[in-house]
Amino acid sequence: MAQFLSKPFGMTPNGEKINEYIISNPGGLAVSVLNYGCIIKNIWVPTKSGPVDVVLGHDTYADYVKDFESSGSTCCGAFVGRYANRIENAVFNVGGKTYQLEANNGKNHLHGTFPRKLYEVKTFGDTLLLEAESPDGEDGFPGNLKISVRYILTEDNALRMDYRVSSDADTIINLTNHTYFNLDGGGDVLGQKLRIYASRYLEGNNETCPTGNILPLSLIHISE
């Protein structure tokens, strides 16, 4: 059975409380999550020499706000949406209608406002549940959304992320978590290797907007 701890992390200009929630299991895995952006602030994994934090995070709420509101935001640790990645020219079509979005990355739309939302938090079993809503027209997207994010610690010391969204209108959605990992807990990552089991990839243009072309993967593409 997981254990839960909460503590203050900051306050918005409107007086809303930012809290840090730490969920840990008997196997020694612990995860720190904020109700601001569903941010994963820390992941401590058990090692022979003690717990090691294997993700990057900021020390204060103000640091996260400064990051997320900058033109070069890293979205460090955040739950990203309504649409992760870039939408070219900040425009798309769905249900026979054209929607113009906020152009927040040059002429394109990038990620959306989910990283800057406040979420209601519930805990049960091995699960931290965060819930919020996104009104119709937010960032230009159609549909009122109900959002739930679950962070679950499993018995084999894994962190599972479960996203669920419902909409009352035709819309598009593409969700991800924007955590940065350093498996050594510090220093650079140049000696670390990542293996991706894939045979194809989604092509991007010179502004890294998806072209819609799904191409075969090769070692040349990986090195690029």
Predicted region positions:
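Active-site loop/turn microenvironments that scaffold catalytic and metal-binding pockets
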Residues: 52-114, 209-216
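Short, well-ordered strand-loop elements centered on a beta-strand within folded domains, enriched
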Residues: 3-5, 30-32, 37-45, 51-53, ...
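Acidic, contiguous internal or C-terminal segments within carbohydrate-active enzymes
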Residues: 24-25, 29-39, 133-185
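Conserved small/polar residues in nucleotide/adenosyl-binding loops
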Residues: 220-224
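A short, polar/proline- and glycine-enriched secondary-structure boundary/capping micro-motif
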Residues: 41-46, 110-114, 139-143, 170-175, ...
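Extended, loop-rich substrate-binding clefts of extracytoplasmic carbohydrate-active enzymes
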Residues: 2-17, 22-26, 97-98, 102-156
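Beta-strand-rich N-terminal accessory domains
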Residues: 7-61, 88-94, 98-99
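A conserved active-site cap/scaffold subdomain adjacent to cofactor or substrate pockets
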Residues: 187-219
